[in-house]
Amino acid sequence: MIKNNKKMKIEKVVLSIGGMGDSLEKGFKLLKILTGRKPAKMKTSPNRRIPALGVKPNMEVGAVVTIRKNIPEILKRMLVTIDNTLKKKQMSENNFSFGIEEYIEIPGIEYQRDIGIRGLDVTVVFKRDGRRVRLKKIKRGKIPARQKISKEEIIKFMEENFQTKFI
């Protein structure tokens, strides 16, 4: 049986917001409104301390939601906010990221007085079949370079499926 391992697809979309204290709570509310799911808390490492920024070990510094279902629908809503245009420098191997300055630009979302004006980051991660070789615990292997997704392949995929323009 021959399998086409060159076929790529979107693995997940990650929405994240940074902040501390009251700002973080507003970010939690915003992500819950956008996705309908409970956000996870991002913490600093147990040994990390940055006094200049007021960061202490195990401090909550952000919120994140990972979306694996209804990806095309959500991604189209997010791309509308940036006019379906991405820069090539926003691309990386196997993923790309972009920022949304104000959540009220997302279609279907209205201004929330208790949240105020906030932005968020969107990361889109791609994958190919055969990735489980690297992720499994027993008999783990390495993924060859041909399985990694290049910037050019991501650009082609986004232009075909989402009519995205690249600068």
Question: Regions from the language model: what does each represent?
Answer:
Residues 1-167:
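Ribosome-associated RNA-binding proteins
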